């Protein structure tokens, strides 16, 4: 892979689903929606995705987070207008709370069918939507030190974005069930902690020779370098509101630039043992903003919210320079309000059907949450749809 290197520009990709206004279930109408966009807004940047119920908004390359977010804001408003025209709603969260994976249709693209042929059951489970943030990095020599340092902030970003507590009508007890689903694919999950670009090239050569890349197109690691000269974070759940997306993107942008400048100044970047990174990923997926995370190689721990608060202070001067000070401060607004996963649970519980966390609803196995009827989570879908609409 070539890595041209670039200034610390930013770009954002935002996946959203389409739901029926009456049933609140997913509907495979992405092609119809994009056709409407073609009519009304020719030249738009909305694209189809793996499933026929999904579209993705793609920002251009921008210098600042406000510019990239405004790009998405315009696209989202146009998309919502066209969705209204054809009678569907936009839904932005990590997973849908009650849709069944077996009912979903693939988009019409040969490579998608090939992926399903290879991944089978787990490939069909991918009813998931996320936010991808690209940040430019100056040279390939810096890429893997920066990615390894970013992995120490995996739980921070995941906890902020977590918005997928339910699956097929089940309260999973997790804050981000999307995280557990996506890592089942053979080329997904956490990247290996490569020491340099040469090791990354050797890895890709092995994947090419073994046919892995031929089957999947590329590696889909949670964080990865791209041919555009960027480092891409891919593990955040899609958020219910645009300002949340902006806060997460600002935090990511500031971190990458902060780490690159530390490298330029001759400092060694922080890393965690791979087993600590894996544990932090699980804790954030499970507990969201209530997670107690491992903060250093000595296995000290802190609440993820305390860590976020401290890092917002540390990154504040840089955020002023990068033009995203307000967006970074919204990290604290998100913490104070609570995560999307908690709001979805509260909406479902308010309508009387979602079990309280810790309730044993099937035998005495102690599993948190429990099985319930899909109607229990209609309120959560309504909350998600309404929150997105109001945030635009």
Swiss-Prot record:
Molecular function in Gene Ontology: ATP binding; glutamate-cysteine ligase activity
Keyword Magnesium belongs to the record: no
Function: ATP-dependent carboxylate-amine ligase which exhibits weak glutamate--cysteine ligase activity.
GO BP, one annotated term: modified amino acid biosynthetic process
InterPro entries hit by this protein: GCL_type2/YbdK_subfam (IPR050141), GCS2 (IPR006336), Gln_synth/guanido_kin_cat_dom (IPR014746), YbdK (IPR011793)
Protein name as catalogued: Putative glutamate--cysteine ligase 2
Organism of this sequence: Corynebacterium jeikeium (strain K411)
Region (Disordered): 347-367
């Amino acid at each position: 892979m070539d890595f041209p290197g670039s200034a610390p520009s930013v770009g954002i990709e935002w996946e959203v689903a389409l739901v029926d206004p009456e049933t609140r279930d997913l509907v495979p109408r992405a092609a119809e929606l994009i056709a409407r966009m073609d009519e009304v807004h020719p030249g738009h940047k909305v694209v189809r995705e793996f499933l026929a119920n999904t579209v993705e908004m793609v920002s251009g390359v921008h210098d600042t987070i406000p510019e990239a977010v405004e790009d998405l804001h315009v696209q989202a408003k146009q998309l919502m207008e066209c969705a209204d025209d054809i009678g569907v709603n936009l839904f932005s969260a990590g997973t849908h709370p009650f849709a069944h994976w077996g009912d979903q249709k693939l988009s019409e693209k040969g490579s998608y069918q090939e992926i399903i042929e290879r991944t089978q059951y787990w490939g069909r489970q991918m009813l998931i939507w996320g936010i991808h943030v690209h940040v430019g990095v100056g040279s390939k020599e810096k890429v893997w030190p920066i990615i390894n340092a970013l992995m120490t902030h995996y739980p921070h970003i995941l906890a902020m974005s977590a918005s997928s507590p339910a699956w097929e009508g089940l309260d999973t007890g997790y804050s981000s069930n999307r995280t557990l689903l996506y890592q089942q694919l053979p080329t997904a999950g956490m990247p290996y902690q490569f020491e340099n670009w040469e090791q990354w090239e050797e890895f890709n050569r092995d994947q090419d020779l073994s046919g892995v890349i031929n089957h999947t197109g590329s590696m889909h690691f949670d964080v990865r370098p791209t041919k555009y000269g960027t480092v891409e974070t891919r593990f955040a759940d899609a958020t219910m509101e645009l300002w949340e997306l902006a806060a997460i993107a600002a935090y990511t942008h500031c971190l990458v630039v902060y780490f690159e400048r530390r490298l330029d100044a001759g400092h060694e970047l922080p890393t965690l043992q791979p087993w600590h990174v894996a544990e932090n990923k699980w804790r954030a997926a499970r507990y969201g903003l209530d997670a107690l995370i491992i903060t250093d190689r000595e296995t000290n721990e802190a609440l993820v919210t305390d860590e976020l608060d401290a890092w917002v202070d540390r990154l504040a001067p840089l955020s002023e320079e990068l033009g995203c000070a307000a967006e970074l401060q919204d990290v604290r607004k998100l913490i104070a309000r609570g995560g999307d996963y908690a709001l979805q649970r509260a909406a479902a519980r308010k309508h009387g059907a979602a079990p309280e966390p810790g309730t044993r609803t099937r035998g005495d196995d102690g599993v948190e949450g429990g099985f319930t009827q899909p109607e229990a989570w209609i309120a959560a879908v309504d909350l998600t749809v309404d929150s997105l609409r109001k945030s635009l």
